[in-house]
From Swiss-Prot:
It is an enzyme of class 2 (transferase). Pathway: Cofactor biosynthesis; riboflavin biosynthesis; riboflavin from 2-hydroxy-3-oxobutyl phosphate and 5-amino-6-(D-ribitylamino)uracil: step 1/2. Belongs to the DMRL synthase family. This is 6,7-dimethyl-8-ribityllumazine synthase. Its EC number is 2.5.1.78. SUPFAM superfamilies: Lumazine synthase. One of its GO terms (cellular component) is riboflavin synthase complex. HAMAP family: Lumazine_synth. The lineage of its organism: Archaea, Thermoproteota, Thermoprotei, Thermoproteales, Thermoproteaceae. One of its GO terms (biological process) is riboflavin biosynthetic process. InterPro entries: LS, LS/RS, LS/RS_sf. It comes from the Archaea. One of its GO terms (molecular function) is 6,7-dimethyl-8-ribityllumazine synthase activity.
Length: 150
């Protein structure tokens, strides 16, 4: 069973709370166990807890959930891009799957609400698939024919 940690941004909590509920439902549907749910103030703060979660033995993958709503300045673009870059850096550094379930940048509130289920489900599904496939890859041995991990 894949063990997941979920990191949820509290900014735009009317949206991220729904994302959390959908993520929990989809994890259960996929047979994954959610071992941690960590709430952080905003999307920009998500990387602050990822390294700690990635070091835990009872976490196979981490799902990030958040919504960056478009404003009058480029703030949303900067927040989303910097968070995504650091999330990817931490995933590669830790060797554990960390998936991006962050709506935005450029989304307005209505668009974000329309994307809640899709982004939450896809982030959970990607985390579960990656964790399972990493385990299969670790155990795989080349025996003269192509090894396919799917």
């Amino acid at each position: 069973m894949v063990k997941l940690a979920l990191v949820v941004a509290e900014f735009n909590y009317d949206i991220t709370h729904l994302m959390l509920q959908k993520a929990l439902e989809h994890a259960k549907f996929l047979g994954a166990e959610v071992t941690y749910v960590v709430k952080v103030p905003g999307v920009f703060d998500i990387p602050m807890v990822l390294k700690e979660l990635a070091l835990k033995e009872d976490v196979d993958a981490v799902v990030t959930l958040g919504a960056v709503i478009q404003g009058a300045t480029k703030h949303d673009e900067i927040v989303a891009q910097q968070a995504a870059r650091k999330i990817l850096d931490l995933a590669v550094e830790s060797g554990k799957p960390i998936t991006l379930g962050i709506i935005g940048h450029g989304a307005n509130r209505m668009q974000a609400l329309e994307r809640v289920e899709e982004y939450a489900r896809r982030a959970v599904e990607a985390a579960v698939k990656l964790a399972r496939r990493k385990k299969l890859l670790k155990e795989a041995k080349y025996g003269g024919s192509t090894v396919v991990i799917d």
